[in-house]
């Protein structure tokens, strides 16, 4: 039990003091700088009085770090880690410890942001490029993305891609009945609001007569069946449909690739490549497509371009496809994906190489074949003659006794109708196979059965094409070399372990080591998501408490932890609204009002939920134009479903009229969706569920300390008021009744019941350590830090939006647009020049084109804030030199930025400023300078000359001839 302490002691001596950057003395100095007598007075000038919560958060006392770690060890011990042979897309793995220590547990990798500034992201971009190369080679297709959320959502994205790409009148999609049930559930959820029909059947007998725009085939099947899909694909193509194969990535080292089989799209999960099951995630989903479909591919794509020196450099390619550009017309609402997990999977492939992966696959297949031979000897019939790692066994009325004996052996099996399924993996040993035989009633010896084993791969489906011939998959076989390769890549990146990342709307706060440590505990890492619930008591205690805490913090009545990104949380929340109206006989309510300043995921999610987006204007202060909102709500009153509003606004201000906005929408029968992206400005001060919102998603990877991982993982749980609770996401593989007592009967939005469950431990520990008072203080300091930055920068770069009392919320927008006219300097020039000062740029051109949005969070010290502000002010002085004619903009340090060590080492320097000004501006420290590895990257060249995977080694050989 924790030692009882007062709230003042907790803040002064506890973890909160470590999490919050400024010291009490610095806070006092910063308050003087912004002209506020106290934090409470500043909050009174920042937040509308009408939304302030009256009671403190009831979260219990904060724990010390040792107490929290001991508590997490107790929870992990309550989870029973059985040998799970359930399969169904989740398998035991062995992550190489060199990868675990140097990537998964390394803040240089997990604290980075999405690589929108590619010059300072070359390390993880190269790792993602390797991931894409691996996926393209194994699937036999031309272009892959840099990860999706999981296999289920990847399947739904593939279905949507097929519908967009095939202009057929039919709105039906065929799904192989041997598809994983969670994948089918996600497909049905995605299809229903869009009016698409899901046809489930046997592709051998049913696909040829179906009129569909596409079909999904599981390869191998969920039951383990291994069938040649070529005749089915040919029949589908003959009728104008696209073929999607959901593939087992490890099996593809032995089996013919989807591309060779004629598939147009391949999807799946890279979990088998060394990533623990984690009770459902996070894992990197993947998608690969034929070249003709590349511009419809959802998610982020890493491409190769050149920098200002003509050297190869990586960047995000084809970004105009993405939701922040195309909004409701985007290919997808996908934003955060699973970058850290894709990096882990790519390094697993680098570690083992193609020969090692094939050897693992052959070993698994051999053990599965031996297992099947033993079961046949015991008198059981296996359903499939051809298989890779999974067999389905007819057991009839013996099922219960076999399950009981298997539990005695600490083994979980997949339970079917008179059948049992068994899926083996790289952790399966001969002793486990013998234990399975004992569960089936026989004491057999592996050594005696093995000689009778026969290859059970389909004879016409064996892989003949080479894969992963590129050098990167062959160079780093010793741990020494791999360790240095990973270090080399991480040194190329700028993450939170090196400097503040002031990205607006991203909340790049501290991801504390203590919060991260439980992630690696076996009790959390190695549970199968469909293991019996009695084996996951620790997880369920954590889920119940976390849901209760999040409901307390937000003022909602019920919470779902299933959505595994903020965008998926938006989608799930809108589906809950849709389900509510359907239950009331009002399915026609489909109008969604969205302010023009909204993040692009809002309209993209609304479109996915089958809603029609109507844009609401903003006024000159950046607030929602209440008169325009009222007029549009009245116009669409009979069909109004919701308003989606971000609060504080994306303009960095608490709008005074938020209660009026909620009242207007409610008066016309609509619901209020309050985007939780900016919840870090409200925790402990205001609760959305109390001032009028009906539903919000909660970005745990922002407000509640899950690291961004370079672009994922994230988690986007949703909180709802009681009337929407019955429509929270459900799942076909579990009971979804939460601690709130509501049964969650909505559609499935993620492959696993609790999304990326293992990273929920991070937010849980964060709240444990902070307590209610610590969380409130963090919010107050986040707002103070933003106002401090705004006050320092306003004389140099005008702050675009403030409230009536001159305050910003937790972020501010500075406006350099006038400087483009006076000097020719662009916002991109400023962003790249900040790299020379050792900083990641703020958010560029969102929500206002040509501006910078800055969010310092509560975790940055006054010294780091001053260093950033000094850099911005120094850049303004450099711009003044251009304005006065000292430099032409084309020959200025801003246009040549970022400067690299190659610039410093040039024999001849022909620029009108010195090397010192270029490389060490305004006296920046020389002893620990971050050196950008490449010059400014040519985005246009990269999109015109799209290269998204490494060429095979044969191409190098041909080029050398």
Curated annotation (Swiss-Prot):
Origin: domain of life: Bacteria
Name assigned to this protein: Glycine dehydrogenase (decarboxylating)
Reactions catalysed: N(6)-[(R)-lipoyl]-L-lysyl-[glycine-cleavage complex H protein] + glycine + H(+) = N(6)-[(R)-S(8)-aminomethyldihydrolipoyl]-L-lysyl-[glycine-cleavage complex H protein] + CO2
A GO biological process held by the record: glycine decarboxylation via glycine cleavage system
Biological role stated in the UniProt entry: The glycine cleavage system catalyzes the degradation of glycine. The P protein binds the alpha-amino group of glycine through its pyridoxal phosphate cofactor; CO(2) is released and the remaining methylamine moiety is then transferred to the lipoamide cofactor of the H protein.
Gene Ontology cellular-component terms listed: cytosol; glycine cleavage complex
InterPro entries named in the record: GcvP (IPR003437), GDC-P_C (IPR049316), GDC-P_N (IPR049315), GDC_P (IPR020581), PyrdxlP-dep_Trfase (IPR015424), PyrdxlP-dep_Trfase_major (IPR015421), PyrdxlP-dep_Trfase_small (IPR015422)
Quaternary structure, from the entry: The glycine cleavage system is composed of four proteins: P, T, L and H.
GO molecular function terms listed in the Swiss-Prot or TrEMBL record: glycine binding; glycine dehydrogenase (decarboxylating) activity; pyridoxal phosphate binding
Record keywords: Oxidoreductase, Pyridoxal phosphate
Gene: gcvP
Pfam families, alphabetized: GcvP2_C, GDC-P
Enzyme Commission code(s) on record: 1.4.4.2
Cofactor(s) annotated in UniProt: pyridoxal 5'-phosphate
Family, similarity comment: Belongs to the GcvP family.
């Amino acid at each position: 039990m924790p030692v009882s302490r007062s709230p003042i002691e907790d803040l002064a001596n506890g973890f909160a003091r470590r999490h919050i950057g400024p010291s009490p003395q610095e806070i006092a100095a910063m308050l003087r700088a912004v002209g506020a007598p106290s934090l409470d007075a500043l909050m009174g000038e920042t937040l509308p009085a009408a939304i302030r919560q009256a009671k403190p958060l009831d979260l219990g006392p904060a724990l010390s770090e040792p107490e929290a770690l001991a508590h997490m060890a107790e929870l992990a011990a309550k989870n029973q880690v059985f040998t799970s042979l359930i399969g169904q897309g989740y398998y035991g793995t062995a992550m190489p410890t060199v990868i675990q220590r140097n990537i998964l547990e390394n803040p240089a990798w997990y604290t980075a942001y999405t690589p929108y500034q590619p010059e300072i992201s070359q390390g993880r971009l190269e790792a993602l490029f390797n991931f894409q190369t691996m996926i393209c080679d194994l699937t036999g297709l031309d272009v892959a993305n840099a990860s999706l959320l999981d296999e289920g959502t990847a399947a739904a994205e593939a279905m949507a891609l097929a519908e967009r790409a095939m202009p057929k009148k039919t709105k039906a999609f065929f799904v192989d009945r041997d598809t994983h049930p969670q994948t089918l559930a996600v497909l049905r959820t995605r299809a229903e609001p869009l009016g698409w029909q899901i046809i489930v059947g046997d592709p051998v007998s049913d696909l040829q007569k179906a009129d569909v725009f596409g079909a999904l085939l599981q390869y191998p099947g969920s039951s383990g069946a291994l069938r040649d899909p070529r005749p089915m694909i040919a029949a589908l193509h003959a009728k104008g449909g696209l073929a999607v194969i959901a593939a087992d990535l490890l099996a593809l080292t032995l089996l013919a690739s989807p591309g060779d089989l004629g598939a147009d799209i391949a999807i799946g999960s890279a979990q088998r490549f060394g990533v623990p099951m984690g009770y459902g995630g996070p894992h990197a989903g993947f998608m690969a497509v034929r070249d003709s479909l590349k511009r419809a591919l959802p998610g982020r794509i890493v491409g190769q371009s050149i920098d200002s020196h003509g050297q190869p450099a990586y960047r995000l390619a084809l970004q105009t496809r993405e939701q922040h550009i195309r909004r409701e017309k985007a290919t997808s609402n996908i934003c955060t994906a699973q970058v850290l997990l894709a990096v882990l999977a790519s390094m697993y492939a680098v570690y083992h190489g193609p020969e090692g992966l094939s050897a693992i696959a052959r070993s698994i297949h051999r053990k599965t074949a031996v297992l099947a031979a033993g079961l046949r000897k015991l008198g059981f019939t296996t359903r499939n003659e051809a298989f890779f790692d999974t067999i389905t066994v007819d057991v009839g009325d013996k099922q219960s006794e076999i399950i009981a004996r298997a539990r005695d052996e600490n083994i979980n099996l997949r339970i079917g109708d008179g059948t049992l399924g068994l899926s083996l993996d790289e952790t399966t040993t001969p002793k486990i196979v013998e234990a399975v035989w004992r569960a089936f009633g026989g004491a057999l010896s592996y050594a005696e059965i093995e000689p009778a084993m026969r290859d059970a791969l389909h004879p016409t489906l064996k892989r003949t094409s080479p894969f992963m011939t590129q050098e990167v998959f062959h160079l780093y076989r010793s741990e020494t070399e791999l360790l240095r390769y990973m270090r080399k890549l991480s040194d190329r990146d700028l993450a939170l372990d090196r400097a503040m990342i002031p990205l607006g709307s991203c909340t790049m706060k501290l991801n504390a080591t203590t919060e991260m440590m439980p992630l690696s505990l076996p009790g959390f890492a190695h549970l199968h998501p469909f293991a019996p619930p009695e084996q996951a008591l620790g997880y369920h205690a954590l889920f119940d408490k976390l849901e209760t805490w999040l409901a307390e913090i937000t003022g909602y009545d019920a919470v779902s932890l299933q959505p595994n990104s903020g965008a998926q949380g938006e989608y799930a929340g809108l589906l809950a609204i849709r389900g509510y109206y359907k239950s009331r006989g009002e399915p026609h309510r489909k109008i969604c009002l969205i302010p023009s300043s909204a993040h692009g995921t809002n309209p993209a999610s609304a479109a996915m939920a089958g809603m029609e987006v109507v844009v609401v204007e903003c006024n000159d202060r950046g607030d929602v134009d209440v008169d325009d909102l009222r007029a549009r709500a009245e116009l669409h009153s009979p069909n109004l479903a919701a308003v989606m509003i971000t609060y504080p606004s994306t303009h960095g201000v608490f709008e005074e009229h938020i209660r009026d906005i909620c009242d207007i929408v409610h008066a016309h029968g609509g619901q209020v969706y309050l985007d939780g992206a900016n919840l870090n400005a409200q925790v402990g001060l205001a609760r959305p569920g109390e001032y009028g919102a009906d539903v919000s998603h909660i970005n745990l990877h922002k407000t509640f300390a899950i690291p961004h991982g370079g672009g994922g993982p994230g988690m986007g749980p949703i909180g709802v008021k009681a009337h929407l609770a019955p429509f929270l996401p459900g799942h076909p593989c579990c009971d979804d009744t939460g601690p709130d007592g509501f049964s969650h009967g909505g559609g499935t939005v993620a492959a696993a019941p609790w999304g990326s469950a293992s990273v929920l431990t991070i937010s849980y520990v964060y709240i444990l350590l902070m307590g209610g008072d610590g969380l409130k203080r963090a919010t107050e300091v986040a707002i103070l830090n933003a106002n401090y930055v705004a006050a320092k920068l306003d004389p140099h770069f005008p702050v675009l939006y403030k409230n009536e009392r001159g305050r910003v919320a937790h972020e501010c927008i500075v406006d350099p647009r006038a400087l483009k006219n006076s000097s020719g300097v662009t916002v991109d020039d400023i962003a790249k020049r900040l790299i020379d000062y050792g900083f990641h740029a703020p958010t560029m051109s969102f929500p206002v084109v040509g501006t910078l949005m800055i969010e310092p969070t509560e975790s940055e010290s006054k010294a780091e804030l001053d260093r950033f502000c000094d850099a911005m002010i120094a850049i303004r002085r450099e711009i003044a030199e251009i304005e006065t004619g000292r430099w032409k903009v084309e020959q200025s340090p801003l246009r040549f930025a970022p400067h690299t060590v190659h610039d410093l080492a040039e024999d001849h320097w022909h620029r009108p400023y010195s090397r010192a000004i270029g490389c060490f501006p305004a006296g920046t420290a020389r002893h620990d300078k971050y050196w950008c590895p490449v010059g400014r990257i040519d985005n246009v060249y990269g999109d015109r000359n799209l290269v998204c995977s490494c060429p095979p080694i044969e191409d190098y050989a041909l080029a050398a001839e």
